[in-house]
Amino acid sequence: SDLIFTDDWRSFPRPPLVAHIIWEGEDVYVINNHYKCCGNGIIEDDEDDEEYRRLQAIKYTKDYFENSLVNKNLVLVGDFNDELSDEKTNNIYWDFISDNSNYRFVDLFIACNQSTDWSYPSWPSHLDHILISNELFNNVNFVQTIKLEQFFSGSWHEYNNIISDHRPVGLSL
């Protein structure tokens, strides 16, 4: 495992972790991220703007994929802290979304459907995503938000206090 972008705290306050794994004899690179939180939903041309910082992180991540991990099995996961369903002008993911022959957010259908399935129910919003490269498009079995609070006697309140304010999003290949 390696940390990337360790020298760019503005775009990556928490450097992404790249894990190289072998899955069914294939090399797979899983990149876990936690992008900058908060903001007002509008990308402003200001290096301190939260959406601008996330947009830069997305651009650098895509460049990293296209220069360092060309034609590799890629899975980008984590807390992206932004909505996939934003309009194009304020959608930090547009570089990936518009490049749909090479990349796919496999949880887009969750983001565009009922809030009961979203990953961040206390807001409510869907901020945790999974992006895959085209090498894995045909390997997706299912994607879902995992409602772990169902396994706690205190339901969401207990899960939120003990584990996280986010639900995990799972991908089966």
Predicted regions, residues:
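Structured beta-strand-rich core segments of catalytic domains in phosphoester-bond hydrolases
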Residues: 1-36
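His/acidic metal-ligating clusters that form di-metal
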Residues: 29, 54-77
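A short local loop/turn or secondary-structure capping micro-motif enriched for an aromatic residue
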Residues: 37-40, 148-150
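Acidic/histidine-rich helix-loop elements
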Residues: 39-53
